[in-house]
Amino acid sequence: RVQREQEAFNEGLQRDGYMRVFEHTSHLFLKRRDQIVCDELEYAQGKNVLELGSISWKAWIDDNDIEPANLHCINISQEEIKQGERNARFSKVKPHFHLMDAHSLEFEDESFDFVYGCAILHHLDYNRALDEICRVLKPGGRILFAEPLGINPVGKLVRVMTPFARTDDEKPLMFKELTELEK
């Protein structure tokens, strides 16, 4: 699974069609999602932060004037890491980028105050990734993920209209996975 995801992202997904559809549907949910994200991200100020993925920090952290003590961004794709590094060249936030699998994080236990990501968990073996997130999260730490949901009718439509914009192993989250987060 990890190798298939890595290859798909290194080779580049066909996101043009997805972005055209997304432009016409995003107003239905992005404003509220972005407000929730911004409110929650204030917790990351001055904290040790881990992003699963290596792109969202630009919009979520840098563009909102959040300054974590340390920001580590992981990705299994070297191409995605390179994109994150390009974004960081002119940023006041200087993330540390790591080519790393979220199923086996190479960080010490209880290393991070805050772990977040955008549209990443649905690419992973959910339970394995969640175990690793909990392992590296400090007691009292927080997690925040914005993920596609299998129950979202707009998301379903976008997925049907843009099958080549995703990998074979992607699976939108359902209520079952969300309730596991509460544990």
Description of each model-found segment:
Residues 1-44, 144-167:
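Conserved class I S-adenosyl-L-methionine
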Residues 50-104:
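Class I SAM-dependent methyltransferase SAM/SAH-binding core
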Residues 116:
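A conserved beta-strand element that flanks and buttresses the S-adenosyl-L-methionine
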Residues 119-123:
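A short His-aromatic
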Residues 128-142:
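A short glycine-rich, Lys/Arg-flanked "PGG" loop and its adjoining helix->strand segment in the class I
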Residues 170-183:
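Short alpha-helix
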